[in-house]
């Protein structure tokens, strides 16, 4: 306790002495005003210098924006077999790890740009003094002394002006980086952010661009060429000026020799080599953009990654694209020979959906589409016309108990003021459902839609991701206020290939971030929309559309089913607004649409859906030459094939005669020529006073036995062929007369 009090007294005495000394000193300075001002000036300079020094040393954090140290990186899009499918970027940069860069490449950059990189703390003061001396001599800022860290700081956080203030900020940022990051961190970031001309950023991208190889495979001379380019990328690019590139590369090799990285003999040998660059890579093919736009929009919606982030984030995306199909689809869409329209501004879209995965194998959004354009025709809605009939009417009717050979009435009808006519204004009376679909009858479609119920049809559309707010019978003919996209239509029709199961289509299979971490997404839905028998019957009927119906024009040798569709132009009589064909092969579904961005008096099609049929069949023919499309559809287990149609014969040779039966009883035999179709049922009639009377039936046979014929009078007989599929009868045969006495 005593010692503590003594310490306190000592401290108080020292404080009093200091205060006394300060007062005496100030009195002396007051008597000599010049000395007071000099002392204050020196103290101010020391104080300000100290503040400035500590601000430079520790103020770099105010300049460094760590968000900018996350470099924009190219998102790579590739197919399932690893083929390059496209790139998305703001800066074309493939990031690499420092461990992947060979030592001889690192030494090329260090020897050229910052020989003392591993020994300084961000600023090389020896180089600074040399540069300051030259600046003073020239009375201007003529030489830089930037280290690799300073270059990185300038490129990431500052501008390119040559002011002392910018240089001070550069020093501050560099010293901050050196205190907070390792040399390897700085060097890796530096190599990844460099620009190499031609829109190429980062050493990995440059390696692939100039040499078609990974940075890990670069040779000494190749690394030297890249190291030399960064001083003036456009000046030293081998694709712009080969002579400059060689000279600059040799300068770098000399620097490596001077720094002790190369022996003299090795230097001379390397300087004698050519540049070894590959042919300058071509720009991305035009046919890729259409698909990449679908990828971007899908990732935005399913993965919640914005377009900007996708173009900066360095993701790796695997897609369902088939490059051959995509190219073929593009070449056919851009071929003007298929189009018959009022002018050459006509547009088209083709979408191909894989049967098994529902993956988008090809998507063309227009004849000249580029990423970001508003009118991607594969993603824009169009009125579907008659392509909606199977989806909203005929297959739902099969689900509700109708059969492909159920009879429907084909005649002009009026439904509370809504008059329905066939496109050709021809009517056939009662016809089978399958025939109504094959011939794309409007009257039967609307009548059947009315019979099963509008809400029933809409329910099936909704389950096929084809919801509509419309409520009228016009839905049955595709007369919608909005419509559907070619992607939606191809996806919906793909259900017929999959036993009635609807699967959401998609372009993206998987996506990983720049660190290789997989990003989860919303799983596509799978819904049993139709019974597999209904789906199979519909597929069979759609095959007949191609062989015998509205899609029978033009040739295609493979298995093909499909449905045509067209919509009327609103103002030009007889013109078409939208032309469709949805085709199904055993392996995939293809949706083709032809029309205009805006349809008006000057923009219309002069021909209907046949031009979409022509384009599709030509496309399939070319695809089949590249990769064989299977020749038969997969029949599901436990289903029946659609029966072949029956043509009833004209019977003109009915004959009647007597013969002996058992126990010598008299009998009569009727005979006639039969059809080769043994499914036909033959009704046998006997004419009586009350008219004709059905006395028997036989199936597939050309004879009938009358066991107890009348022998006392002449009897007349007829035969009528019956179609068992529709229960329709044909024409009566010629009469056959039977009499024992004549």
What are these regions (language model features)?
Residues 419-421, 453-491, 500, 504:
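Mid-domain, small-residue-enriched loop/turn segments at the edges of structured enzyme/sensor domains
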Residues 94-99, 344-347, 371-391, 404-407, ...:
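Short active-site loop at a secondary-structure junction
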Residues 118-127, 203, 263-265, 371, ...:
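Short, well-structured active-site flanking segments
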Residues 108-110, 256, 329, 358, ...:
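Active-site SXXK
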Residues 2-334, 338, 360, 674, ...:
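Juxtamembrane regions of bacterial inner-membrane/periplasmic proteins
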Residues 1-2, 17-24, 30, 254, ...:
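Soluble, non-transmembrane domains of envelope/secretory-pathway proteins that act on or interact
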Residues 137-161, 402-457, 472, 502, ...:
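Conserved catalytic neighborhood of penicillin-recognizing serine enzymes
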Residues 319, 323-339, 363, 370-374, ...:
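A penicillin-recognizing enzyme superfamily signal
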């Amino acid at each position: 306790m005593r010692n503590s009090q003594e310490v306190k007294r000592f401290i108080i005495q020292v404080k009093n002495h200091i205060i006394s000394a300060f007062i005496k000193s100030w009195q002396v300075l007051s008597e000599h005003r010049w000395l007071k001002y000099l002392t204050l000036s020196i103290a101010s300079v020391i104080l300000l210098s100290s503040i400035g020094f500590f601000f430079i040393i520790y103020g770099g954090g105010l300049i460094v924006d760590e968000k900018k140290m996350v470099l924009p990186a190219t998102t790579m899009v590739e197919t399932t077999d690893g083929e390059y499918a496209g790139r998305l970027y703001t800066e074309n940069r493939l990031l690499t790890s420092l461990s992947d860069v060979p030592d001889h490449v690192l030494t090329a950059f260090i020897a050229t740009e910052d020989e003392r990189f591993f020994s300084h703390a961000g600023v090389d003061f020896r180089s600074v003094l040399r540069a300051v001396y030259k600046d003073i001599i020239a009375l201007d800022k003529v030489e830089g002394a930037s280290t690799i860290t300073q270059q990185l700081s300038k490129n990431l956080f500052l501008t390119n002006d040559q002011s002392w203030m910018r240089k001070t900020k550069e020093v501050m940022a560099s010293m901050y980086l050196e205190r907070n990051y390792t040399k390897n961190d700085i060097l890796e970031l530096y190599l990844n952010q460099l620009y190499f001309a031609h829109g190429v950023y980062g050493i990995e991208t440059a390696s692939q661009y100039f040499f078609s190889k990974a940075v890990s495979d670069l040779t000494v001379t190749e690394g030297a060429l890249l190291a030399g380019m960064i001083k003036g990328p456009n000046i030293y690019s081998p694709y712009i000026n080969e002579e400059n590139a060689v000279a600059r590369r040799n300068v770098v090799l000399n620097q490596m020799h001077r720094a002790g990285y190369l022996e003299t003999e090795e230097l001379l040998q390397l300087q004698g080599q050519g540049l070894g660059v590959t042919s300058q890579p071509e720009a991305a093919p035009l046919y890729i953009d259409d698909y990449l736009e679908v990828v971007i929009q899908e990732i935005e919606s399913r993965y919640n990654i914005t377009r900007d982030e996708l173009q900066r984030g360095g993701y790796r995306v695997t897609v369902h694209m088939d490059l051959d199909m995509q190219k073929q689809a593009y070449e056919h869409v851009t071929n003007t020979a298929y189009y018959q329209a009022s002018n050459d501004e006509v547009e088209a879209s083709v979408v191909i959906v894989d049967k098994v995965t529902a993956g988008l194998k090809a998507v063309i959004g227009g004849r000249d589409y580029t990423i970001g354009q508003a009118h991607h025709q594969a993603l824009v809605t169009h009125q579907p016309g008659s392509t909606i009939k199977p989806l909203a009417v005929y297959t739902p009717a099969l689900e509700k108990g109708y059969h492909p050979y159920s009879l429907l009435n084909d005649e002009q009808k009026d439904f509370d003021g809504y008059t329905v006519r066939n496109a050709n204004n021809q009517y056939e009376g009662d016809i089978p459902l399958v025939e109504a679909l094959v011939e794309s009858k409007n009257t039967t479609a609307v009548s059947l839609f009315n019979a099963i119920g509008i809400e029933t049809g809409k329910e099936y559309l909704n389950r096929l991701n084809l919801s509509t707010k419309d409520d009228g019978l016009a839905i049955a003919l595709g007369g919608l206020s909005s419509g559907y996209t070619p992607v939606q239509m191809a996806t919906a029709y793909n259900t017929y290939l999959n036993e009635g199961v609807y699967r959401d289509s998609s372009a993206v299979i998987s996506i990983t971030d720049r660190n290789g971490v997989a990003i989860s997404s919303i799983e596509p839905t799978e819904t049993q929309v139709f019974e597999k028998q209904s789906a199979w019957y519909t597929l069979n009927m759609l095959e007949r559309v191609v062989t015998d119906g509205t899609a029978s024009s033009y040739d295609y040798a493979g298995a093909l089913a499909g449905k045509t569709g067209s919509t009327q132009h609103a103002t030009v009589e007889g013109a078409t607004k939208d032309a469709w064909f949805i085709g199904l092969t055993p392996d995939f579904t293809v949706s083709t649409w032809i029309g205009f961005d805006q349809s008006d008096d000057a923009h219309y099609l002069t021909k209907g859906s046949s031009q979409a049929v022509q384009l599709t069949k030509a496309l399939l023919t070319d695809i089949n030459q590249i990769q064989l499309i299977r020749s038969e559809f997969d029949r599901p287990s436990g289903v029946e094939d659609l029966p072949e149609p029956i043509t009833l014969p004209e019977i003109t040779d009915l004959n009647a005669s007597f013969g002996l039966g058992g126990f010598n009883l008299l009998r009569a035999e009727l005979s006639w020529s039969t059809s080769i179709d043994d499914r036909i049922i033959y009704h046998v009639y006997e004419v009586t006073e009350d008219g004709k009377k059905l006395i028997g039936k036989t199936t597939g046979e050309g004879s009938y036995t009358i066991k107890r014929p009348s022998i006392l009078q002449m009897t007349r007989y007829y035969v009528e062929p019956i179609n068992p599929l529709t229960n329709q009868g044909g024409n009566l045969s010629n009469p056959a007369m039977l009499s024992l006495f004549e």
